[in-house]
């Protein structure tokens, strides 16, 4: 079985072969894996990790993030409004911003916590009711609200 470092290096090598104009950050999805499994990658110098559950992220990452300020934690799953306050405390990026209520909670909490997270708006381009994401016809208004009215740092 390949080590986590070997797998990381292979992925990184394949990305470099593509000769991208802009740098690419690999987000190692660490959900469900214990910290002991991920630690070699942290020790190797990788610093972007993705989790899809707030409580799992808190229990796994709270201690190690205090000692390693270079670690960046990405919330890659659906974020429920009732978990938003806790999410701001542990995550650096939210990849699933999809409604105004959530945006408002995240903004207020990041002000209270003196943090500045980076956000990706999740868009439901197929307008499928069973899927998350802001409908595409509401995207411009939502983006303007987030960036101009409450000043969230939308990066994607």
Predicted regions, residues:
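Conserved alpha/beta-domain cores
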Residues: 1-156
